[in-house]
Amino acid sequence: MTEKQSNLIVRTVTGVLFVAVMVTGMAFRPEALILLFALITGLTTWEYCGIVNQREDISVNRFITTAAAVYLNLAFAGYCSGVTPPAVFIPYLLTIVYLLVAELYLKQPNPVNDWAYTMLSQLYIALPLSMVHVLAFMSTPPDGEVRFVGLVPLSVFVFLWVNDTGAYCAGSLLGRHKLFPRVSPG
């Protein structure tokens, strides 16, 4: 078996397991969707902060930034499902203010960069993953009752997966020269 075939098999098995977890988490129960995306938000924010903190003169508070991201995800879930009022976002905003103000007193070499990387984690990871709840919970106009529609976020992910898979296959079969060598796989 060649290295390319082995790589394809590993990608396929990983992809099938990932899709199974995502479909199970999105399609059946709202609690599963909320838990799945809170977990994904927490893990990706934690990983992002770890990568950013490896840079010289950058120090992002990994724990509080991750906790804020997970809280934002859960706050969106509660608000969109109709369980909590809009005031549920106030603790998140206070946490963001804390992260900004605390940076002034930590005497870091470049606090503006630390702010930028902290806010980027919230805008690049936490906010988009929290928006899944906006798609999943819909209110019906006549009675205003909120209902869970897991098919909508699932369809968005299916479109993304199909597009990504098609791009990978086209690039593997047709492409001989990488358009962007720094970001192209393999």
Residue ranges and their predicted role:
Residues 2-186:
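Membrane-embedded alpha-helical bundles of polytopic integral membrane proteins
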